[in-house]
Amino acid sequence: MNSVFTIIFVLCALQVAASFRQSFGPSMSEESASMQLLRELQHNMMESAHRPMPRARRVPAPGETRACGRKLISLVMAVCGDLCNPQEGKDIATECCGNQCSDDYIRSACCP
């Protein structure tokens, strides 16, 4: 008799657990819709990642190049003929790396 009640209790518990999951868990349609959305987002990201950039964005136009690090040192050496001697508290590294700076600016900021 005890085993019959145990079996009935287990079956009722399984039924309650299954109905609880259906009531509060995500439905299959919601789950598949979110998976579909995730796949679409991944597809769009992969498409844009493999799209080649136009040449105008890859290669800067003349006069738009910035000088940073060794490139700046080479530019100062070419303009001044010597290393930079900062004048007037100008920070040419920040200016020339952040924006395009002209030879005249380098002469006024560095050349003796």
From Swiss-Prot:
Disruption phenotype: Severe reduction in Ca(2+) signal in AWC neuron and in chemotaxis in response to high salt concentrations. It is found in: Secreted. Keywords: Cleavage on pair of basic residues, Disulfide bond, Hormone, Secreted, Signal. Its main location: secreted. Disulfide bonds join C68-C97, C80-C110, C84-C111, C96-C101. Expressed by ASI and ASJ sensory neurons. It holds the Pfam family Ins_beta. Residues 20-58 form a propeptide. Residues 1-19 form the signal peptide. May be processed by serine endoprotease bli-4. One of its GO terms (biological process) is negative regulation of dauer entry. Probable insulin-like peptide which negatively regulates synapse development at the neuromuscular junctions. Probably acts as a daf-2/InsR agonist ligand to prevent dauer formation under optimal environmental conditions. Acts on AWC sensory neurons to regulate high salt chemotaxis responses. This is Probable insulin-like peptide beta-type 5. It comes from Caenorhabditis elegans. The lineage of its organism: Eukaryota, Metazoa, Ecdysozoa, Nematoda, Chromadorea.
